[in-house]
Each structure stands twice: as structure tokens, then as C-alpha cells.
Amino acid sequence: KKDKKHVSNFSVSGIKFGGELIPIFAGPNMVESEQLIYDIAKLVKQKGAHFLRGGAFKPLSFPYRSAKYNETRHLGLKWIYEAGKEFNIPIITEIMDQRLVEEIAEYTDIIQIGSRNMQNYPLLTECAKTLKPIMLKRHYGASLRDWLGAAEYILFEGNKKVILCERGMSVPHTHRETSRFSLDLQVIPAAKELTHLPIVSD
């Protein structure tokens, strides 16, 4: 970032990033059924959020999931896409697997790369090549330098529509199962000093 006043701004489906607007993302952690995602999309639109989020290929902390989920993953992507169209709200969904890049890029408005894959460089590179807007979450143990370095992999492929997302940090020494991540408020202004990319938080 050569000029401290310079901030990249771009629009996704008419929603501007990098300006005064604070884009709001809302929706379920995982797309479980067609009816549920339609009902939630309707509420998201009514409440004024800008994007519908939902994981079709959702990674979970534990491997236990129903057989129904495994059968409906690809359908889930289509369900959230159709719900977004029905209520005229753009969508964002997470990608986990390079083999799904083309499929997910076809349906989503923003590709989300979760904290688990922040430094999965082959995945970053393949997603970047779609030229779709990409939200890059900071891994809970990653430094600011690591985070910005991961973003550079996307920018290097000519994709300038990168949104940084502060995910929070893990506090392992507490070993509390009731708490997951603590928002690192310090990293947001620190990142703004070093990068022109827009930043959101989860």
C-alpha cells in the first residue's frame, strides 16, 4: 500500500466494498434443506442484509454428519442459488476442494475461502483464476503478514476483487469448549495501514 489514503473499491451485484457502506452477510451455517434456505433468504431480505450466506459443502469441526447431508451437498448449492434469485439477494458460499471451483463459481456471487484454507495456495490460485470476488478469512493462528501474503496469491493471478475477513483468534490456553474465537480488533486497523483491500469481520 503506497498511498495510505488509497482503498480498493468494487461492487458485487451492486453492493459496494471499500466505501462507506458496511455490507452485511446473513444466513445459516449450512444449507440443510430447500425450504429452510428459502425461509431464511426471505428473512435476510426483509431485515435488510446485503448477502445471503450458507455452506453447501460445509466443513465441520467433527466428521459426524447425516447421510442426507452427503447426498444433498450439490443440491444445497443450487438451493441457495435459487433462493438468492427468488429474493434478489446475492450469495456467498465456502469452497473446500479445488475440484469444485468451476461448479461453485457458476452459482455464487462471492467465493469464500475459510480460515482452514487461508494458506491452501493451490486452492487460492484456482479460485483467483475465476475472477470471481473472493472473501479470504484469516486463520485464527495466522499473523497479519501471513494473511496479506495469502491475499497476494489471489491478486497475483489478476483477480483484484479480494475481501479480507477477520475471523478471530483462538485462545487455546483456556481450553473452554463454550468459547471458540475472540475477535482481534487490533488486526483490522493494522491491516488497513498495510493494505488497500476492503476488510470485514465475522
Regions found by a protein language model. Give the residues of each.
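Conserved, mostly hydrophobic/aromatic
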Residues: 27, 44, 52, 104, ...
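N-terminal amphipathic alpha-helix/helix-capping segment at the start of soluble metabolic enzymes
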Residues: 1-25
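Catalytic alpha/beta core domains of metabolic enzymes, predominantly
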Residues: 12, 17, 130-201
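Active-site mouth loops of central-metabolism enzymes
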Residues: 21-39, 62-70, 90-94, 114-115, ...
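Glycine-rich, proline-tolerant flexible connector loops at the mouths of alpha/beta enzymes
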Residues: 53-75
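Alpha-helix-loop-beta-strand connector modules within alpha/beta enzyme cores
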Residues: 67-93, 126-133, 185-199
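Short, well-ordered coil/turn segments that N-cap beta-strands
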Residues: 20-22, 48-50, 85-91, 107-109, ...
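Catalytic beta/alpha-barrel core
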Residues: 53, 69-72, 88-97, 109-122, ...
